[in-house]
Curated annotation (Swiss-Prot):
The active site is at C397. GO terms for cellular component: cytoplasm. The gene is arcA. HAMAP family: Arg_deiminase (MF_00242). Its EC number is 3.5.3.6. Its main location: cytoplasm. It comes from Salmonella paratyphi C (strain RKS4594). It is found in: Cytoplasm. It catalyses: L-arginine + H2O = L-citrulline + NH4(+). This is Arginine deiminase.
Length: 407
């Protein structure tokens, strides 16, 4: 049955969330391919799965519904149109050649849906297909070459789609290693019974077009509430993507302002939520680099003619105070000395998931920052992340809220 989905803030009571448990895609990571697949290291997949189970159970113990991406994708494949569309989009004639692609699609179409879902996220090698499928393409590849590359970054469900007030952006991803993720989410939101026919807006990203430089990823999008959205312009989210999303939000009267902040273009700051998260009404966790006075920041508002009015702000902090209607934003910076703070930011100390005002989930290893949270009255529900953290994503990165109260 279709349900109502609404995300009204970053800090209101979290009610439903989508996660992705580590699976086949991470088992495909090797030292020789991990950089191409946007990982810095290979993980112990079994241990990462155990850590992820603790994360999911921590949320369930707080009364939060946890939906798993593989389950949603499997159930979506039960819809014939969804399966046909996914096979057409994920197995391209132009990538494999028309005859080989047709043979692979036919073989995959007969596969049990859970196994097919496993390959749609985990990839498929030439060595896994039946010997009866013969083609020049097969003859010219090694058995360990990929027909479909794995999608290990599905672990970070925050990025591929993000719910903003009464709608969702299904994001055109910046890197080729992640672009096929979007098709899996497009299918889920179009055909899965929980979403099909739903009364929600699709702001951006659900068209069969080349979005070129207009890329957007959910780790850069913070729904700070009270009609405002904060978006980081990072190495993954561009000003072009921000403008398209802002125009859609204003067109559908879902936001009154979008704050756009320019982020340093380096790996440790790949998304806004790796350096900044909203954890209480007036409180943000930040790595100090993002709130320097020289960081450029703009507020976008409707111009009354379908376009955008742009106002440059003196500082990000000032823009946040105006948007939230508060006198002073409280900033909790990454803990420890300069060396410890850099290490903990790298290990996602600022990338916490707020469950309700003043209560967050974060990695237990970030002892200095967690101590600062505690002293500031923020409750941290700790989870292990020795393996999960190797992917450079914390609790916020690994979660896509589907329902959350406003403020």
């Amino acid at each position: 049955m279709m349900e109502k989905h609404f995300v009204g803030s970053e800090i209101g009571q979290l009610r439903s969330v989508m996660l992705h448990r580590p699976n086949l895609s991470l088992k495909r990571l090797t030292p020789s391919n991990c950089q191409e697949l946007l990982f810095d290291d290979v993980l112990s997949v079994e241990r990462a799965g155990e850590e992820h189970d603790i994360f999911a159970n921590t949320l369930r113990q707080q009364g939060i519904e946890v939906l798993l991406l593989t389950d949603l994708l499997t159930q979506t494949l039960d819809v014939a149109d969804a399966k046909a569309w996914l096979l057409d989009t994920q197995i391209s004639d132009y990538r494999l050649g028309p005859t080989f692609a047709a043979d692979i699609r036919a073989w995959l179409a007969d596969m049990p849906h859970r196994e097919l879902a496993r390959h749609l996220s985990g990839g498929l090698t030439y060595g896994e297909i039946p010997a009866s499928i013969k083609n020049m393409v097969v003859d010219t590849h090694d058995i360990n070459d990929f027909i479909m590359k794995p999608l290990p970054n599905h672990l970070f469900t925050r990025d591929t789609s993000c719910w903003i007030y009464n709608g969702v952006s299904i994001n055109p991803m910046a890197k080729p290693a992640r672009q096929r993720e979007t098709n899996n989410l497009r299918a889920i939101y179009r055909w899965h019974p929980q979403f099909a026919g739903g009364d929600f807006i699709k702001y951006f990203g659900d068209e069969d077009i080349n979005y070129d430089h207009a890329t957007l990823e959910g780790g850069d999008v913070l729904v700070i509430g009270r009609g405002a959205v904060l978006i980081g312009m990072s190495e993954r989210t561009t000003p072009q993507g921000v403008e398209f999303l802002a125009q859609a939000l204003f067109k559908h009267r879902q936001a009154e302002r979008v704050i756009a902040v320019e982020l340093p273009k380096h790996r440790s700051c790949m998304h806004l939520d790796t350096v900044m998260t909203h954890i209480d009404i007036d409180t943000f966790s930040v790595y100090p680099e993002v709130v320097r006075p020289d960081v450029q920041c703009w507020t976008l508002t409707p111009d009354g003619r379908g376009g955008l009015k742009r106002t440059q702000e003196s500082t990000l902090v000032h823009a946040l105070e105006k948007a939230l209607g508060i006198d002073q934003v409280r900033l909790i910076t990454t803990g420890g000395d300069a060396f410890e703070a850099e290490r903990e930011q790298w290990n996602d100390a600022n990338n916490v998931l707020t469950l309700r005002p003043g209560v967050v989930v974060g990695y237990e290893r970030n002892i200095w920052t967690n101590e600062k949270y505690d002293k500031a009255g923020i409750t941290v529900l700790p989870i292990p992340g020795d393996e999960l953290g190797r992917g450079r994503g914390g609790a916020r990165c690994m979660s896509c809220p589907l329902e959350r109260d406003g403020i």
